[in-house]
Regions:
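C-terminal ends and interior cores of transmembrane alpha-helices
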Residues: 67-87
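Hydrophobic core of transmembrane alpha-helices in multi-pass small-molecule transporters
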Residues: 88-108
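A membrane-interface helix-boundary motif in multi-pass transporters
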Residues: 57-60, 148-170
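Cytoplasmic membrane-interface "Motif A"-like loop-to-helix N-cap segments
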Residues: 51-66
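Extracytoplasmic gate region of multi-pass secondary transporters
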Residues: 1-43, 110, 141-150
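Multi-pass alpha-helical transporter architecture, strongest
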Residues: 76-80, 159, 164-192
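A late C-terminal transmembrane helix in Major Facilitator Superfamily
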Residues: 122-156
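Intracellular juxtamembrane helix-capping segments at the cytosolic ends
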Residues: 107-122
């Protein structure tokens, strides 16, 4: 779900923004670049908060990040679909806000899912766990969900439906990340 959101927005942002006549090709590239720059800052902030506030537990931070990412995806979808009617200038501003929200909050969970896998398995299985998280993240989240599912929905139905499917992916991400809170709490108690 995390990779679906990352790549569902990342892979399609320039095309989506141009086909919806929200931005020109040059403007959409700048917006996507800002999304990535803000994402780098968000990754650092997420790592810091995980260490300092949640004492190394990744799940609570992932839930928070995925929730705010969901809000960003919903804003992105609502502006693009016309649910939020706005002037072209306000539309671009709202898209920038949405892309910044998504960027800031999605790259933390992307980084932390691998760390989380390392923390939750025995040390002798750490490499395998990290490998599986990466493999399935890219195969299912990027290749299947982002490229095939989101792209197929955009072509077969509409961009509005495609972006709504990314929002559903973000919502699923919130719930999947929340499922690990108890496991991390129990692990922290057993290591104390």
């Amino acid at each position: 779900a995390v990779y679906m959101v990352r790549y569902g927005i990342g892979d399609w942002a320039p095309t989506y923004l141009q086909e919806k006549s929200i931005m020109t090709a040059a403007e959409s590239k700048v917006a996507f670049s800002v999304h990535n720059i803000v994402g780098a800052v968000g990754t650092l902030a997420c790592g810091w908060a995980t260490s300092k506030i949640f004492k190394g537990r990744c799940a609570p931070m992932n839930v928070i990040c995925m929730f705010f990412c969901l809000l960003g995806v919903l804003l992105y979808w609502m502006v693009g679909s016309g649910v939020i009617a706005a002037s072209p200038a306000l539309q671009k501003t709202l898209i920038y806000i949405a892309l910044c929200l998504i960027g800031f909050f999605i790259y933390g969970p992307v980084a932390l899912t691998g760390v989380q896998a390392l923390n939750l398995v025995p040390k002798n299985a750490a490499g395998t766990a990290a490998g599986f998280v990466g493999l399935f993240g890219y195969l299912l989240g990027d290749a299947v969900c982002s490229k095939i599912l989101v792209g197929g929905i955009a072509v077969g139905s509409s961009w509005d439906t495609a972006m709504l499917s990314v929002a559903v992916g973000a919502l699923i991400g919130v719930f999947l990340c929340a499922l690990l809170i108890r496991s991390e709490r129990n692990l922290a108690k057993s290591n104390a």
